[in-house]
Amino acid sequence: MPLVNYTEDPLHVLHPKDGAAGTDRPKALLDAVEEDPDPLLKLAAAHVVSSQQFSRDELLQLFRLAAQYETTPALMHLPLAGKILISAFYEPSTRTRLSFESAWHRLGGAVMSITDPKSTGIAKGESLADIAEMFNNYGDVLVLRSSDGEAAHNMLENLRIPLVNAGNGIDEHPTQALADVYTLAKWRPELFTGQVAPESRIKVGIIGVPSRMRTVRSLLRMLSLFPDAIDEVVIISREDENFDPGQREELEEAGLSLRLVHELDPLLPELDVVYINAIAWVGDTFEAMGEGLKLDRDSPLKKDAVILHPLARGDELSTDLDDSPHNWYFAQARGAVFVRMALLTTVVRRISAVMDTPEN
């Protein structure tokens, strides 16, 4: 490995590989979306379990606040000081857990972290209802990840603090969808503000299985709030059964145009956005899906297409794309911190500390 002269280039290690860094794009998003605190006030003290529960206006204001955090470090004047986040991850995680904990720390709060269910009362057979009662006494927000698709729902009845679902089995991952769509909103803000001409709408390709992958399920539901921005969503999958009963109908009734194909490369020249995932969590392990559906530097991508990936990746996404302009997946991971900061600020009723317009 060649040596780097840090005297000549002291910020060398801070140079991101992708081309989506900097503040120009979040600033453009700020310019495109007028501040309105009212939609966010509706989320105060709310549980966040599904991407289905958000409105279009709520998303736009969350994205605007995230862009403020991303462009204005001075805005982070510790609005969550004195607040405690319970970070309960009963399923393996690196990015999501650290992203939430980073978001909370940046806002001045303290974190209590659980990363091994064997170290909790669950290992002794304690019920989720009793655990929820204990969480009420220890923290101000619970971020929960579990391989049990019903865990988040089962805790709600006994929780008096907001719960944020960080992934529940194969069901949903709503804050990953927030990070995904926030990335697209920075890429092309006009798509999400109703200012896009029909001929400028985008075609999105999603490599994954909507019925088995929580990231894909949540993303599709969130995209369905912006059908006027999307010409078509193409699901690329080798599976025979890709949708749960009623899932496709729900999305099409919301206005999304859906198509299913089995081969990737013939479609790539048409796609403006390529979203790729190959992991579906099942129980305490995962299934690798989509064998043969891979992206690398030789893939026939559209010149200005962007690639998104929720990470962690395997060989479905080659590292030789990391230095290409198609790489928006690192920006996606960076932006996840800011959009989670926006969401957490909202659910703990601290909007008045960071928005120009005070709460009512």
Region annotations inferred by a language model:
Residues 51-79, 170-199:
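Short N-terminal or domain-adjacent regulatory/targeting segments
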Residues 304-305, 310-360:
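Adenosine-phosphate binding glycine-rich loop
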Residues 90-103, 186-276:
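Glycine-rich phosphate/diphosphate-binding loop of Rossmann-like nucleotide-binding domains
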Residues 251-327:
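Rossmann-like adenosine-cofactor binding region
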Residues 2-98, 358:
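Positively charged, low-complexity intrinsically disordered leader regions
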Residues 78-185, 314-319:
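Phosphate/diphosphate ligand-binding glycine-rich loop within oxidoreductases
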Residues 161, 228-231, 299-306:
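A short helix->loop->beta-strand "cap" motif at the edges of active sites that frequently abuts
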